[in-house]
Amino acid sequence: MTLSYPIASNAAHPPRLSPAYKSTVKRSPQKPLIIMRHTLSELTGPVYGQEAVRESDHDLTTQHKGEPLGERIIVHGHVLDEDGRGVPNTLVEIWQANACGRYIHVVDQHPAPLDPNFTGAGRAQSDSEGYYRFVTVKPGAYPWGNHHNAWRPAHIHFSVFGHSFISRLVTQMYFPGDPLFEFDPIFNSVTDEKARMRMVSSFDLENTQPGWALCYRFNIILRGRAATPMETK
């Protein structure tokens, strides 16, 4: 007997086409999808970029000579399966805008300053219990031109790799209480309210370091009814 895992409902994950998110109109597939056969090779397993994950890769505030501007924060949590068990040795990558809401990217030219001490990218490997931890600065909101006076809520992009690089899930983590939630078509492309809130981190006073950094918890649940919504593009 062959058991297939059920595909999650469209309400729990963003659709490929969400007209309010205007760029999906051009990017979403217009023809039936084609299944590509996967063949094994020596590059099937994770190679973590060009070298192994270093102990300091999780700290985005120590990658340059000076300390970046902005509010220092800790972001941590667990990568979990549907039964709440930690998934060990998982490559977790993040990328984000700086405290002024600007990315180090040639396409991002909106009038906000770049920070020479902040690149905005980090990576970590989950431990034996599926736990990961990052130190970074809280990203700023930024305009993005989707519609009149369009601003993205503060967020951090997450990428989670499975046992091969074709097993990659991408999502975004938001911060609690952001007033921009109701105006953001990307956040609201996940139509199930409970699923949307699984993309919102929780403030973690217990793990806040007094006098140094606030802490936010963000658990990534890979599948099941409580799965973290993932991008489908």
Model-derived regions: residue spans:
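Beta-strand-dominated extracellular/periplasmic modules and repeats
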Residues: 2-233
